[in-house]
């Protein structure tokens, strides 16, 4: 029996490298440059995780197909294969949560930094994650439909005259009533029980697939909503900039008024000085003429 994670690292090998020199050459101060390098390192790590996530999706797809198409309850490896798939699905769920949080963090950093390069890289990660979530949903949807078809065919082996309503109740709802009726009406109860057990196993697998699809749908919605959430800080920054600009303009206006007032006050002082000087001169002339005539 092989180890389900044997050579798993080979499955997760990186097919792409994300080099920092692929980004625009911009001038940064020493502290900003360190911040930019840290940000791009985080982007690189996220892309590596996205590679891993893609590989896990492919593994889940292949193993689900093999398990559901070749289901044999008499095979001692059946439980092992089912557990292997369950482990991969759990690993994908854990990775999804980590990716969601990390992508949200880099988008928040990018928005607050107002660095378009950071914004573009964070958005690229988000869109790539959305594409992979959609791929995973399609994988589960295909396997779900395939499982339903196989379960329906198996049920019709022991009850060829089963109606569509009955098949749906057995395959999708796991109706025990129809199971018991089919067993009672079958001439080969041993074979019928074996087939019905397989149908029940496929029904349980259907429930797992539907649960995963529901979780992926919610995750896809959350990642789409992330863009709307990130718009709010941008609007706040723009409003703050607008307010600051308005305050500056008001300050300049007040300053201009103060300058004009100061100039006006100086002019008034000069006029007062000249008027006083003129009065003194006139008085001096009058007094000089008066005392001159008396002599």
UniProtKB/Swiss-Prot annotation:
Domain t-SNARE coiled-coil homology: 196-258
Keyword terms: Coiled coil, Membrane, Protein transport, Transmembrane, Transmembrane helix, Transport, Virulence
Extent of Low complexity compositional bias: 1-18
Keyword Ribosomal protein carried by entry: no
GO biological process assignments: exocytosis; hyphal growth; intracellular protein transport; protein secretion; vesicle docking; vesicle fusion
Membrane side Cytoplasmic: residue ranges: 1-270
SMART domains the UniProt entry points to: t_SNARE
Transmembrane region(s): 271-291
Source taxon at top rank: Eukaryota
Location(s) in or outside the cell: Membrane
Spans annotated as Disordered: 1-31
CC annotations in GO: endomembrane system; extracellular vesicle; plasma membrane; SNARE complex
Molecular-function annotations in GO: SNAP receptor activity; SNARE binding
Family matches, as Pfam families: SNARE, Syntaxin
Keyword check for Transmembrane: yes
Coiled-coil residue spans: 33-110
Membrane topology category: Single-pass type IV membrane protein
Record-stated family: Belongs to the syntaxin family.
Protein name according to UniProt: Protein transport protein SSO2
